[in-house]
From Swiss-Prot:
Residue stretches spanning the membrane: none
Gene Ontology CC annotations of this record: endoplasmic reticulum; extracellular region; membrane; protein storage vacuole
Domain Peptidase A1, residue spans: 18-278
One annotated GO biological process: proteolysis
Activity regulation, free text: Inhibited by pepstatin.
Tissue expression remark: Pistils.
Native source organism of the sequence: Cynara cardunculus (Cardoon)
Post-translational modification: N-glycosylated.
Subcellular location: Microsome membrane; Protein storage vacuole; Secreted, Cell wall; Secreted, Extracellular space, Extracellular matrix
pH-linked activity: Optimim pH is 4.3. Active from pH 3 to 6.5.
Protein name: Cardosin-F
Subunit organization: Heterodimer of a light chain and a heavy chain. An intermediate form is produced first, and undergoes proteolytic processing to remove the internal plant-specific insert (PSI) and the propeptide.
Family: Belongs to the peptidase A1 family.
Length: 281
């Protein structure tokens, strides 16, 4: 079991992103960040734009600093202080930076240090589908919130430790198999991506039919209804939640963004190298 835990309340920004609050430094300087399972770096703006990190205002600053998430304090965390940003980076956005939760690449992610400092071994996401409710979502470091899922999670092993990546066996449109993934496809759950991305050949079919019933793994189906994969735009405009992307990583690659993670409570378990899905509640 995890020795500690922290619950982070998330704000839903029009179904396009989910962000919550962290603190950096001693005393903590507060920032709102997107918790992104598709990247590994923590970065916040330096004291030149937006909510800004001021290194001289922290007694623990060394080019690393303490990061406070809920009741957890992660010590000596590397992060990027962004001193310059493109003018439109934060256009109409309510968050300051990004906290990466994928595997170690060029820096040590926050959750690696949580693990190494004996704090937590897993974290889980619940993303609220109702933009009108005050509670936008919840990120739990160190456990699961039983109020936000039904039944048991279906766990799949991580196949490649760069993203939280796993294999999928089939993609169905309606109840019909496309057969596209018979030779093998890969996917990763990405809380920092708004849409669901996949190979052009299949996404074109989905967007033509706009009747996807989901993805299949280990003979367990995860369905998507029109309310879950169609986004609301201006007035009478509707936007497809599927977007084409022809990338490969051990096979054709799907990115299961917020469109997928809203209906499915998602667990990222580093202790056992598993990703788990259960119906969200």
């Amino acid at each position: 079991a995890d020795s500690g835990s922290a619950v982070v309340a998330l704000t839903n920004d029009r179904d396009t992103s989910y962000y919550g609050e962290i603190g950096i430094g001693t005393p903590p300087q507060k920032f709102t960040v997107i918790f992104d399972t598709g990247s590994s770096v923590l970065w916040v703006p330096s004291s030149k734009a937006h909510s800004m990190y001021e290194s001289s205002g922290s007694s623990t600053y060394k080019s690393q600093d303490s990061v406070t998430i809920g009741d957890l304090v992660v010590k000596e965390q590397d992060f990027i202080e962004a001193t310059e940003e493109a003018d439109n980076v934060f256009l109409n956005r309510l968050f300051d930076g990004i906290l990466g939760l994928s595997f170690q690449t060029i820096s040590v992610p926050v959750w690696y240090n949580m693990l190494n400092q004996g704090l937590v071994k897993r974290f889980s996401f619940w993303l609220n589908r109702n933009v009108d409710e005050e509670e936008g979502g919840e990120l739990v470091f160190g456990g699961l919130d039983p109020n936000h899922f039904r039944g048991d999670h279906t766990y799949v092993p991580v196949t490649y430790q760069y993203y939280w990546q796993f294999g999928i066996g089939d993609v169905l449109i309606g109840d019909k198999s496309t057969g596209f993934c018979a030779p093998g496809c890969q996917a990763f759950a990405d809380s920092g991506t708004s849409l669901l991305s996949g190979p052009t050949a299949i996404v074109t079919q989905i967007n033509h039919a706009i009747g996807a019933n989901g993805s299949e793994e280990l003979n367990v189906k995860f369905g998507l209804t029109p309310e879950q994969y169609i986004l609301k735009g201006e007035a009478t405009q509707c936007i497809s939640g599927f977007t084409a992307m022809d990338a490969t990583l051990l096979g054709p690659l799907w990115i299961l963004g917020d469109v997928f993670m809203r209906p499915y409570h998602t667990v990222f378990d580093y202790g056992n190298l598993l990703v788990g899905f259960a119906e969200a509640a």
